[in-house]
Amino acid sequence: MNLMNATPTEYVWKYNPVSGIPAGAQQNYGATIDWVLPGGTGFAIATNDIRRQTLNPAVTRAITARFEAESDQQPYASPHETNVIAANVLDSGYPKSGLYPLELSGNQRVQLAGGLMVGRTEGRMQLAGGLTEGRVQLSGGFHGRPLVRGRSRRPPRWCGAELTGNGLPEQAEVTSDTYKYFLRTQGPSQVVEEPGVFSQRQFMTTFLPSVVPHPFDSTNPGDFPAQYSAIYKGRTAFEDTFWDW
């Protein structure tokens, strides 16, 4: 079809929601596109280029049908995928990749809670105490070999770096951001305790906005409004000419 001779229609430009490509003005997704050409030859060349890159409507329908047949388009697993997950993960016990052989030195790789599990233990970081200690332990357990707990040379102890808090947060920590914003904008200036700081209300009552009625009526170029006149060039009077640029 010669686009320069195409008959303009009442349709407008829009994106094709099926393919995501700017499909132009069209009657439906299965018909040939009728283009509106307000831009002449240059617009027609760009339009032809887009048409060459746009899939045939039949191809787009085939792709869409295949996608709908192979996917339920839901944000969760299909029945087949659910069965695969259950057979390979949920029904197979503990994931083997998350376990490591027990280190008799007492240094686990990652242990979230103390104790042994089938001769294996989790990780080098221990978050809760057991019979052994990790390299980084966040809560206490027994120090020494697991099987000689009563004969250990050292008593049970807490970790060297303990994560604690005093339970009494600072007032600034528990103050909501909304109230902090209120204090900054409309609260009294005493809250800031800095000289020269005004609240929003105090600033508006101290520095009243000036109103200049008919600002460009003055012929004096030294007046303040004259500096913002479109026909003022910084000379002794106004000129009815505009800037060259």
From Swiss-Prot:
Recorded GO CC terms: host cell nucleus; viral capsid
Annotated propeptide span(s): 116-167
Induction of expression: Expressed in the late phase of the viral replicative cycle.
InterPro entries named among the record's database cross-references: Adeno_PVIII
PTM notes: Cleaved by the viral protease during virion maturation. May cause the middle segment to be shed from the capsid.
Domain of life of the source: Viruses
Keywords: Capsid protein, Host nucleus, Late protein, Phosphoprotein, Virion
Positions marked as site (Cleavage): G115, L116, G167, L168
GO function term, MF aspect, one: hexon binding
Keyword Phosphoprotein: yes
Subunit structure: Interacts with the peripentonal hexons as well as the hexons in the facets. Part of a complex composed of the core-capsid bridging protein, the endosome lysis protein VI and the hexon-linking protein VIII; these interactions bridge the virus core to the capsid.
Family statement: Belongs to the adenoviridae hexon-linking protein family.
Note in the entry: All late proteins expressed from the major late promoter are produced by alternative splicing and alternative polyadenylation of the same gene giving rise to non-overlapping ORFs. A leader sequence is present in the N-terminus of all these mRNAs and is recognized by the viral shutoff protein to provide expression although conventional translation via ribosome scanning from the cap has been shut off in the host cell.
Protein name: Pre-hexon-linking protein VIII
